[in-house]
């Protein structure tokens, strides 16, 4: 087994390598003056089982192209099997046609990864579970729920805890965490009565006097979580925190969270901290390196990955 890292998240790659007690394969990744990407693998990988570690996070197009070129380099270097380890799968929100003459970009990206030569994909908390079906190669979608559960038990009293989905689409995800914590759930139902009218946050569930934890797969601008926290507090919640797998945190989302009424926002290291963002103690990071490392070990040894979640 060999591990190779792209440039999207080198700290996470090193943490995964440390977990597996395996070195990162020597490689050289360079961007030419015109923006083109060049990759050279500096070790023999012929006949090897190679795991290429690369999130397709910001800048999404650069990191996606880098992943494809790394896969192509491994194919041409005669690697026996290539697994694309993509902690954060970019373009996942474009998983369906949203209108006439629009693409399904998540499917296109899945096709590109397979066509480049990847034999399988390993990722974490896809925005929509059905994206697994977009790939024509084996795909393992890991869940960070147990990572979140362990942290919540360390930092929160669970007796009066309420797990809240910030939208109707995230109910299954919220219910899974609530089951682990033996907690109840509530739902924030966002509705816009008509064009030009502000969204109304309807709360489904009893939140008065409860300590609420919003649980979602992704935080981009932070607006949804901040607004949901305000709605919960106005309905009588004692406090509101948020746990999110992928902290994309664009458009100074950290500054928005810092000024919000959220107690804290907890994200994982699937995405690197955005450059030039407003630092805030309200944003805390957990690592998914042990989760990914164990899944990689199991894949390399032809063991069950699903048993991680039994």
From Swiss-Prot:
Q: Which cofactor does it need?
A: Mg(2+)
Per UniProt, the keywords (alphabetical) are: ATP-binding, Cytoplasm, Kinase, Magnesium, Metal-binding, Nucleotide biosynthesis, Nucleotide-binding, Transferase
The record's cofactor note says: Binds 2 Mg(2+) ions per subunit.
Protein name per Swiss-Prot or TrEMBL: Ribose-phosphate pyrophosphokinase
The EC number of this protein is: 2.7.6.1
Q: In which pathway does it act?
A: Metabolic intermediate biosynthesis; 5-phospho-alpha-D-ribose 1-diphosphate biosynthesis; 5-phospho-alpha-D-ribose 1-diphosphate from D-ribose 5-phosphate (route I): step 1/1
Q: Which CDD domains does the entry link to?
A: PRTases_typeI
Taxonomic source organism: Maricaulis maris (strain MCS10)
Q: Which residues bind D-ribose 5-phosphate?
A: 192, 216, 220-224
Output the lineage of the source organism: Bacteria, Pseudomonadati, Pseudomonadota, Alphaproteobacteria, Maricaulales
Annotated compartments: Cytoplasm
One GO cellular component term of this record is: ribose phosphate diphosphokinase complex
Q: Where along the chain is the active site annotated?
A: 190
An MF annotation (GO) of this entry? kinase activity
